[in-house]
Amino acid sequence: MSNPDPVTFQLAGLGLRTYPGEYPVDGITPYRHQWALHDALTAREPGTFVNDAPTGGGKTLSWLAPVISEGLSTVAVYPTNALIEDQKRNISDLLNDVDGGNDCQLLAVTSETLQNKYAEQFPEASSNGKRLSLLLKQAFSSRKTVILLTNPDIFVLLRREIYRERIGEIKRFEVAVVDEFHRATRKERNTMLFLLDEMYDTNESVCRLNHLVFLSATPEVRLEKQFEEAMVAPYYRVEDFGWRNTPHPAISRETPSTISFSPGDLPADYRAVLPPVDLLIEPAPTFGTATKMLDNEEVVLERLATGRTVIMLDGVHEIDRVYDRLCRTDLTRVERIDGFHREGVREKINTFDTLVSNSAVEVGVDFDTDQIVFSGHDAASFFQRLGRLRTRSDRSAAFAYAPPYLFHDLEPLADSLSRQWVNRTEFEKCIKSAYVDSSTPASFDWRYSAVEAYDHVEERVEDAPSDDQLAVRKTGWYRIESHFFNREQEGLSESDLQRIHGVADSELLETLKTYRGESVQTLVYNQRSQTVQTYNLPYLLRHSDISFHTRDDFLTHLPDELIDQVSRLEPYSSGYCIYRGDFQPSEIDSDQAAGRLFTYKATGELYSLLSDHPRDIRTPEVCTGLEVEVTPSVNGVDILKDDLSTDQILCYPLEGHVSQIQNQYSLGSFGFIYPLLYSEGEAAVAFGHDALYLHCRVQDRIQEESSTFDEVLDF
């Protein structure tokens, strides 16, 4: 069967109008959304503000300028440590141009900085919690505006005081900014919104937080409903300008603040934030883009020769294959950035002609490029990657690889829009409606987020003075009901929630307390880059040249300066691994894309969970005794088995083949479940939060056949 011809679209550029005025940043003429958030914060207007300006439209400056000029201490939460570092660099460069920038103290806090930089700064502190407490006390005692850049994991630990240190300084922040919020999972969104809502609703004499700012794509219906109905703070879309009786004078004109434009058509008062793009889409399965590209190598090389190009793929093994092949061509300055190759990022960004990458550059890495080549396994990834072509008015090119089902749905749309410059908003609606929805199930809210929140509330009750405990519990219950239960479901009571909470044992609750959950990772020494990190164990076993070692032997292979990092990372990993590069299969089994055969094995508690508990009553449980099997064998795999067997991890096994389960429960290719050796037949297993999501989908099927809601509450 011949390959279908690609479909093409001409996407109009996106321009934002500039509006002059007394803005507190030198050399800046702001956009409407920047004026809007400036006016809200300088007027001290309390609320939840969502800024969904396009990528490259200056969302960071929209909050940074007013909080610094007005002296509003702010905690800004970013999804990745790379983005924290990037923002720290960008904000530092801006401070001299912002009114009040000289009176600002900028802090970047991650687990790495707490273990290294701040451990040296506060040698008397014996834990991360104590270091963070001392750091914030010192910052606030300076009487400067404090800007804390951190990740969601640190923020959640701060708010819940899981560091076991009373870090009261978090209550002194007046503004909370959450970046890239649309990229968070359902569990992550629920956790963040609940904790921020609780902080906002606390008496101002206790907690000063009055402004919640979310930098995000346009919120979908469910998320907008959460903002409007669950949060105590009034909800505003920044572009709506709805909190001002008299809008800013510069914005009272009839001209639109946002326009689409074709090449050469951008009016003088507008700046391009997204260029006109010639978009070509071809079909390729998820994790199959590299194969598709290499099968059409001549065409791909012709495209890459026409301009500076960024390639964004899904799997590191795809990067390995494409990068290795491109390095053997006549292309110059081919670079790669991924989880194993983050050294020298700035130099690579400045010098590449072709950059091969994955989600490592999807957010947090600024680059300029003439064109992009990317895989779009879901709608969010498709538009995030397409949006990396930005802040240019010149016509650009994009080459996308989409799931085959989506490609076939787009063929008639492309024919109907042939030779037209298509409005991006309309195009985005069409694409999003065509993707299969593999989002997490709505029942996760009341099955698990409610449990997590209830446990949090009960801990707050225990810490409260006896006279306040009843009020804390009632307020907490109302917040749980607002956030996680459908108001149309009558008859829910606190006893119902206590019953749900009783089902979850303490080990499961500990898993829920973490922001991102857990996965099966191992501690890796990368001999190529001379770095230590944790990484996904299934990927390493399938696609890497690795060996496993005892801890003592592992340490003998490390440079002295890396040994201190081991104690920081080993609590989050299983085993000790040395990485030498890519796995090179033998000629007999030369399918590099597939890699080694890898599976987990059902033993001990995991076997009992599968064999002794029917699917209709089986729940995720924290198990030990996990084993792995890999063919061809890996040096030291028996050592890994010993380390892995004693670790505790949240598991949910199901009977059936992986692909069967993915199809049956609409998990999509990124609903991570793994094959499981089971003596009674085919089986698969999910870990961490993925285990909870899969359990919800299974129970939703059972709920469809249940006659009463009480049966569902009992799982």
What does each model-found stretch correspond to?
Residues 1-715:
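N-terminal helicase ATP-binding lobe
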